[in-house]
UniProtKB/Swiss-Prot annotation:
Transmembrane segments: none annotated. InterPro entries: Cellulose/chitin-bd_N, GlcNAc_Chitin_IntDeg, Ig_E-set. This protein is a spindle body protein. The keyword Signal applies. Coiled coil: none annotated. It comes from Heliothis armigera entomopoxvirus (HaEPV). It holds the Pfam family LPMO_10. This is Spindolin. Keywords: Disulfide bond, Signal. Homodimer; disulfide-linked.
Length: 351
């Protein structure tokens, strides 16, 4: 079976060429770390990969495709593609890309670290689902100045292999009960900590971005977690196609004297499966113990005014205003959103 690394998609009478576009370089994205460490080219079954989790990710896809096609070369091509396309962990949301429920339910409902790509037959994204395996992923370690710090202001760097503007960034963090060794990264265990436009800036002298002299650098206040955690970074283009890029970043904080034992959380619940999914962005509670993990009102209020104004010019067709789509039967009317936005945007911007 032949696979094309590039594809042109015809959407809304627009031809859009999709190719590689970038990755997190600091802290380094999971798929980028595997690509840089190498070892995927020989032998074909991935035994030459020295990093334990990168090898497990490779062999997960290799064995899946081998079982499907009974062709070792096809299986190797699929697994190598997951490493080779480290700058194209992408998904297309269409003009409704600001609708969080649409994103969670239809665009990247599972396999978040793979940007939802879990089928080798789907061109150009392929199967990158090995990156979603729980396990002992190597983190970027950030030292703490004090064991009593509640957050750390850290400058993040995204290396664009192709520049896309206008655009904006979102950064999520796994919650305090997340266990990287047993849990999948799912929307239900993510908390939004950053949402804003980011200008291109010259890269620093310590940058590992070799694809571009300019990078997206932005400072994020990261809540301190006592155990290893994951940042989930979304780089979203502002256009009718709604192309977005999704990276999992493995991180840990280095305590000066180690965290107190009582502060370390060991999850005692069963890790949710990839199919155990519900939307966590509805305005209303559904009864029982259901509670919104990511509040959509505050999520929408966080969208920068420049994002809103730029988006409006693209959203005049098909009623594509903010929050106008349905999520689990809730109709979000534009007028209601506008009223909320005007009254509460400034107060909620720093949520």
């Amino acid at each position: 079976m032949n696979k094309f690394y590039y594809i042109c998609i015809y959407i809304n009478i627009l031809y859009v060429c999709v190719s590689g576009h970038g990755y997190m370089t600091f802290p380094i994205a999971r798929q980028r770390r595997c690509s840089v460490r190498g070892g995927q080219w020989w032998p074909p079954n991935g035994d030459g990969i020295t990093d334990t989790m990168c090898r497990a990710a490779y062999q997960n896809v290799y064995n899946k495709v081998l079982n499907q096609y009974n062709d070792p070369q096809e299986a190797a091509t699929a697994a190598q593609y997951m490493f080779q396309q480290d700058n194209e962990y992408a998904a297309l949301a269409g003009p409704d890309y600001t609708n969080l429920c649409n994103l969670q339910q239809n665009v990247v409902p599972n396999n978040l670290c793979a940007a939802g790509a879990d089928d080798w037959d789907v061109v150009p994204f392929g199967d990158k689902s090995g990156m979603d395996l729980p396990g002992n992923w190597v983190p970027t370690v950030i030292p703490l100045d004090s064991n009593h710090q509640s957050s750390v202001a850290l400058e993040l760097e995204f290396c664009p292999t192709a520049v896309h503007d206008p655009s904006y960034y979102e950064v999520y963090i796994t919650n305090s009960g997340f266990n990287v060794h047993t849990d999948n990264v799912v929307w239900g265990n993510l908390e939004l900590i950053f949402n804003d436009t980011v200008p291109l800036r010259p890269k620093s002298s310590t940058s590992t971005c070799n694809a571009n002299p300019n990078v997206y650098r932005f400072t994020v206040s990261i809540p301190v977690r006592p155990a290893q955690f994951v940042l989930y970074v979304r780089w979203q283009r502002i256009d009718p196609v709604g192309e977005g890029f999704y990276n999992c970043v493995d991180m840990a904080f280095d305590y000066a004297a180690g965290p107190s034992e009582e502060d370390v959380i060991y999850p005692d619940y069963e890790a949710p499966g990839q199919n155990a999914y519900t939307c966590h962005a509805n305005r209303n509670k559904y009864g029982g113990n259901y509670e919104n993990t990511i509040d959509e009102d505050k999520y929408q209020a966080q969208l920068d005014e420049s994002i809103k104004s730029r988006y409006d010019k693209y959203s005049r067709h098909k009623g594509g205003k903010f929050g106008q789509k349905q999520c689990n039967g809730n109709k979000h009317h534009y007028n209601k959103y506008t009223k909320y936005y005007n009254q509460n945007y400034k107060n909620n911007k720093n949520y």
